[in-house]
Amino acid sequence: MSIQKNAYVVMDTETSFRNGLVFDFGWTTMDKRGNVLGSADLNFLDVICKEKPYYINKIAGYARRQRKAVHKVTTFAVGQRLFNLHIQHLKTAGYRVILCAYNAGFDCRVLAGTSRAFGCGKFLRHSVELLD
């Protein structure tokens, strides 16, 4: 029996004022040695068009970061697919996937809510562990 390596997916979300929909989602995945296994920083244009972001005053900063290719602009459905493909890749490579966040319960709840609001079904398509 081999021991699984841990992959820590450190994630963060930013939400809108009105309905708490996620308009900004980012993650960095590392192993226990700090090697980066993947990362993304996504802005969801479909959510921004529908909702007033909580950090509306930061939108200009997001635009600058998008021009520098730090943030990627996409839709929520594409972001969800990218995240789940990343998780699938980690699991296929034999990693034990652990989601981490300052308030992981909140992040998971608002991601699931945004997924429902945009008709994308369950946000997470793979079983993972949660570290809050």
Protein language model regions, located:
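Short, conserved catalytic or adaptor-binding loops enriched in Gly and charged residues
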Residues: M1, T29, G121-R125
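Residue-level detector of functionally special positions within alpha-helical transmembrane segments
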Residues: K58, E129-D132
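Substrate-recognition/cap helix-loop segment adjacent to the acidic, metal-dependent catalytic center
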Residues: G105-L130
